[in-house]
Design a protein with these regions (language model features):
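Extended, well-folded catalytic/binding cores that form a central cleft or groove in large enzyme
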Residues: 1-175
């Protein structure tokens, strides 16, 4: 049996329309499941999310409890995998002070899932008055946190990644 490959054009407007429909016609909890599953590193996540949404429009808010359906159970597994990895990183992530004046903290991670934004909220609260960067080397992204609480996630250029790798070669650990 051969697999078909599809070329799908993405549209921000259509994406937002679908996400709004999930919140309004299924539930906010189903929306949160979808948002967590989107960042999964699983190659089949698109099909799992699609099947979950399809069941959601049929079952409504009860879809998040309908794990008797394999498609919903698969979604639950994806979400749990993303959450577990985020929690593990929250527990073990350590920063190095790579610049002293002003102090800049850096942590380099390589998670399976694209969880750097999930980590940002936790560490923004914990290190609110610090400048820090959480660099996800696998997904070529980083969280940049300014002292005082403002943060952003960005895709990095090759030059930015090289600079972060150079900064990471310093020694002091700060946790």
């Amino acid at each position: 049996m051969s697999e078909r490959k599809w070329n799908v054009e993405s549209s921000i407007k259509k994406m937002n329309s679908v996400l709004d429909a999930i919140k309004e016609k299924i539930s906010h909890e189903a929306y949160e499941y979808v948002m967590k599953a989107i960042v999964s590193g699983d190659a089949g996540r698109g099909d799992v999310i699609y099947q979950f949404i399809t069941y959601g429009f049929t079952l409504g808010a009860k879809v998040v409890m309908a794990v008797q359906f394999q498609e919903v159970a698969d979604m639950f597994t994806l979400v749990r995998s993303v959450q577990n990895e985020a929690y593990r990183y929250i527990e073990v992530l350590r920063f190095k002070e790579v610049i002293h004046k002003p102090p800049l903290l850096l942590s380099v991670i390589e998670p399976k899932h694209d969880i750097v934004a999930h980590l940002a909220n936790h560490f923004a609260d914990r290190f609110n008055s610090e400048w820090f960067i959480i660099y996800d080397a696998r997904h070529h992204k980083a969280v940049f946190h300014e002292a005082g609480g403002k943060w952003e996630v960005r895709l990095l250029s090759e030059n930015e990644e090289q600079r972060l790798k150079e900064l990471n070669e310093t020694e002091e650990e700060y946790s």
